[in-house]
């Protein structure tokens, strides 16, 4: 029974790879990492990441490779494991380095900014703008006071 499960997983892997080549990775990332119930469980994160890396390499598809890096980073980010944030940032930085013009690189940049600047206990970045009456407004002018920031617009 154990060998049959291994063979079944290998067959599933081959089917997933065939599907990935046909669809450029759409839906494959979750399936390999075991997040999609319909696949009957995954391979575990380490093996799934290795398979994703190999898939990105052999496919030659830049979009798929960018998706793999972003998926790995997101998986680390949400895992809650010790040191996972460092691993996530490494993947986001790699994505930005290899695919600087990809839309996921922009998202990665935002994730890194949030991790480095928007955490509990950190000083709030200054916000400069106009109030409803057109007067200059700086968040730093209200340091030490309770402030409510309400963003609104007509879009």
Residue ranges and their predicted role:
Residues 137-155:
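Short active-site neighborhood of thiol/selenol oxidoreductases, capturing the structured segment around
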Residues 69-72, 91:
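TPR/Sel1-like alpha-solenoid repeat signature
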Residues 78, 86-132, 140-143:
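N-proximal helix/coil linker or "cap" segments that precede and/or mark the start of modular domains
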Residues 52:
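Active-site substrate-binding loop specific to GH73 endo-beta-N-acetylglucosaminidase modules
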Residues 1-11, 15-27, 35-46, 55-66, ...:
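Short solvent-exposed coil/turn linkers within tandem alpha-helical repeat scaffolds
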């Amino acid at each position: 029974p154990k060998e049959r499960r291994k063979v079944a997983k290998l067959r599933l892997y081959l089917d997933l790879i065939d599907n990935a080549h046909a669809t450029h990775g759409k839906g494959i990332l979750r399936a390999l990492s075991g997040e999609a119930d319909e696949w009957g469980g995954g391979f575990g994160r380490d093996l799934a990441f290795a398979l994703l890396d190999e898939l990105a390499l052999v496919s030659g598809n830049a979009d798929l490779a960018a998706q793999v890096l972003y998926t790995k980073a997101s998986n680390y980010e949400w895992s809650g494991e010790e040191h996972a944030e460092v691993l996530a940032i490494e993947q986001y930085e790699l994505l930005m380095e290899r695919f600087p013009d990809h839309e996921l690189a922009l998202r990665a940049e935002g994730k890194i900014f949030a991790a480095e600047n928007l955490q509990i206990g950190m000083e709030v970045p200054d916000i400069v703008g106009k109030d409803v009456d057109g007067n200059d407004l700086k968040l730093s002018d209200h340091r030490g006071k309770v402030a409510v920031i309400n963003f609104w617009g007509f879009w």
